[in-house]
Amino acid sequence: MSNEIKSISSSNSSCPPNEARSGERDKALSLVLGQIERNFGKGSIMRLGDASKMRVETISTGALTLDLALGGGYPKGRVVEVYGPESSGKTTLTLHAIAEVQKRGGVAAFVDAEHALDPVYAASLGVDIENLLVSQPDTGEMALEIVDQLIRSSAVDLVVVDSVAALTPRSEIEGEMGDHAVGSQARLMSQAMRKITGNIGKSGCTVIFLNQLRLKIGVTYGNPETTTGGNALKFYASVRLDIRRIQTLKRGTEEYGIRAKVKVAKNKVAPPFRIAEFDILFGKGISTLGCLLDMAEETNIVTRKGAWYSYEGDNIGQGRDNTITWLEENSEAKEKIEKLVRQKLTEGSEVSANSMKPLASAARAANTPPVMKKISNAA
């Protein structure tokens, strides 16, 4: 009897070497995670599946077509760059983002390095200019220091810098006209990006940098266009938008707006290289009803046959302008169409950010280990 007890106890005490090694590794991992949290604070390191928010929150751009192209809008807690030629709608696009933030009770700041902000035009786009924080800095260092302090406060939801090209280093301002300061602006931007990026993620503030285009000298093949301020902003930006004017809108001989095309040149939080088009009306900004009509037609909520647009089998307007006028006059139908459009656009978009969880749960259901791809050691 005693021999049987000894054999049972010895078999229970002996564990396979792999399980013993795994237990030691788990214990060591829990110890080091606890040590890191004690040294650097809770939340300094975590498993991705334990995060309270898996999906990146967004700020609406003010254009429904661009929201779709970006996967919801500008991501919170990220750097965004908007660049394009002159009079293409860069400032208008960011003023609409400011208006959207203020509508939701947020705080927005506008760092006007170009000293060209028109408060009357901003108010016509829906910006609450009385509560908008505005700074017109003298130097690039001053502008970026203001941006850094606003981000550190964690009290501002959106900061717009207009523009990177106007962030003049102090050495260039204090020097004489014609002095060469090669790379001074690029060094300034590189240092600023290193300094503010970590604080942006912690505060949840979105920072939008507007940028201008320049031409590279001596480029025969490829695109000669480049943006100012060096390459640092290109790397640190989660989203880069290339905005262009593709058409001038006319009624007879009178010009009343432009048609803008935005290409998502870079996107870390959604699929990139999508394209959005929308109308920008002079004195009014982005045509929200025009965006709604475009998306309703694309999702077959509103159909078009020839010049006639129809909704629920009834003709609502002949031509685009008349249909937009009908949407303005019929607010109930407009709200219903907008609700249907947003439902169509969000179908199937709620997907977990942790791609290993569905794989592991499916494997457990089948009582088989998850299949992992092996990495070949062969050179």
Swiss-Prot record:
Gene Ontology cellular component list: cytosol
UniProtKB keywords: ATP-binding, Cytoplasm, DNA damage, DNA recombination, DNA repair, DNA-binding, Nucleotide-binding, SOS response
Keyword Cytoplasm tagged: yes
GO molecular function list: ATP binding; ATP hydrolysis activity; ATP-dependent DNA damage sensor activity; damaged DNA binding; single-stranded DNA binding
Region span, Disordered: 1-24
InterPro entries on file: AAA+_ATPase, DNA_recomb/repair_RecA, DNA_recomb/repair_RecA_CS, P-loop_NTPase, RecA-like_C, RecA-like_N, RecA_ATP-bd, RecA_C_sf
Keyword Ion transport recorded: no
Gene3D superfamilies listed in its UniProt record: P-loop containing nucleotide triphosphate hydrolases
Low complexity bias locations: 1-14
Binding site for ATP: G84, P85, E86, S87, S88, G89, K90, T91
Subcellular location: Cytoplasm
GO biological process: one example: SOS response
Alphabetical list of SUPFAM superfamilies matching this protein: P-loop containing nucleoside triphosphate hydrolases (SSF52540), RecA protein, C-terminal domain (SSF54752)
Primary location class: cytoplasm
Entry similarity comment: Belongs to the RecA family.
Function in brief: Can catalyze the hydrolysis of ATP in the presence of single-stranded DNA, the ATP-dependent uptake of single-stranded DNA by duplex DNA, and the ATP-dependent hybridization of homologous single-stranded DNAs. It interacts with LexA causing its activation and leading to its autocatalytic cleavage.
Protein name: Protein RecA
